[in-house]
């Protein structure tokens, strides 16, 4: 964990998430094995500290982290947060990660069906999954975290139940059993095929409709041409909308672009320019 924490601090500014994960691991050991461990937490903290201190961007690496923490905590700094720091509507929480919800349900059902006890690994993955779900409920930027830990939890459950699952499959796949229940198997497989085909068709139609409703690719052509004609080469265009940057950049390599920065970072770097942008937009 020491070298991992060091590399994590260099590669990802949200690397401090390693600390609560190691705490959850220690809690899992305490609950399942009745022993208290502290070394993983200490090594993770030491690795992260070294990574932030022995860093080509030091001390900006620490300032960058400090400016991000208010967004995570939800306290704010008076600057309107970026869209990624808003939470999804309740139904969107399911729509965006419905596969993860189904996978979580499958993991819980497998545990219940086979009456599995919680091992250290399974409990850790479950606690980490719960933590990531809370972060996901907090802000949409954590949408990529939670499904990954759901997959880890479900994989851990399947691993624990692998012996029982294999026995069940062998029993169901026995030729005598298949012959006895051939009508049930035929109905099940036919129904599964129909459901999969219908779901694929609905998804294809929905995707086509969404693509047709996208903004036209040439929506910023006139603005790009105007900037080329009326601004010096390599002059900076201040644009905080990351989703409009590809369209602008595609039509204009004449200018330099400031795009996609979190509003807090933009404000700290150049407060007057950010306030001007806010007033103009």
What are these model-predicted stretches?
Residues 1-13, 22, 47-52, 130-136:
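Membrane-interface alpha helices of multi-pass inner-membrane proteins
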Residues 17, 135-174:
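Hydrophobic/aromatic-rich transmembrane helices and adjacent perimembrane loops
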Residues 18-46, 160:
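Perimembrane helix-loop-helix junctions
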Residues 32, 36-40, 161-185:
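Membrane-interfacial, low-structure loops and terminal tails that flank and connect transmembrane helices
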Residues 32-42, 96-97, 107-128:
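Membrane-interface helix-loop-helix junctions at transmembrane boundaries of multi-pass membrane enzymes
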Residues 45-65:
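Membrane-lumen/periplasm interface segments of specific transmembrane helices
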Residues 63-103:
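Juxtamembrane membrane-water interface segments that cap and precede transmembrane helices
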Residues 170-232, 242-245, 263-265, 269-281:
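Membrane-proximal, lumen/periplasm-facing interface regions of secretory-pathway glyco-
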């Amino acid at each position: 964990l020491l070298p991992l924490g060091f590399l994590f601090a260099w590669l990802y500014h949200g690397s401090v998430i390693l600390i609560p994960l190691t705490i959850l691991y220690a809690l899992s050991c305490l609950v399942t094995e009745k022993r208290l461990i502290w070394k993983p937490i200490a090594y993770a903290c030491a690795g992260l500290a070294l990574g932030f201190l022995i860093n080509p961007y030091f001390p900006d690496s620490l300032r960058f982290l400090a400016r991000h923490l208010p967004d995570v905590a939800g306290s704010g700094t008076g600057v309107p947060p970026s869209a990624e720091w808003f939470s999804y509507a309740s139904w969107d929480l399911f729509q965006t990660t419905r596969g993860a919800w189904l996978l979580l349900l499958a993991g819980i059902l497998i545990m219940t069906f086979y009456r599995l006890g919680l091992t250290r690994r399974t409990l850790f993955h479950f606690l980490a999954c719960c933590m990531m779900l809370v972060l996901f409920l907090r802000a949409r930027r954590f949408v990529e975290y939670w499904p990954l830990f759901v997959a880890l939890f479900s994989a851990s459950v399947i691993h624990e139940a692998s012996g029982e699952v294999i026995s069940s499959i062998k029993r169901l796949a026995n030729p005598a059993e298949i012959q006895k229940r051939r009508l049930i198997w035929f109905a099940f497989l036919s129904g599964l095929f129909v459901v999969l085909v219908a779901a694929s068709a609905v998804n294809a139609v929905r995707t086509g409709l969404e693509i047709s409703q996208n903004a036209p690719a040439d929506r910023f052509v006139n603005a790009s041409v105007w900037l080329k004609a009326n601004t010096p080469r390599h002059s900076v265009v201040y644009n905080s909308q990351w989703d409009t940057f590809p369209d602008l950049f595609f039509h204009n390599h004449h200018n330099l672009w400031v795009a996609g920065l979190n509003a807090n970072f933009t404000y700290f770097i150049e407060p007057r320019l950010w306030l001007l942008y806010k007033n103009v937009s």
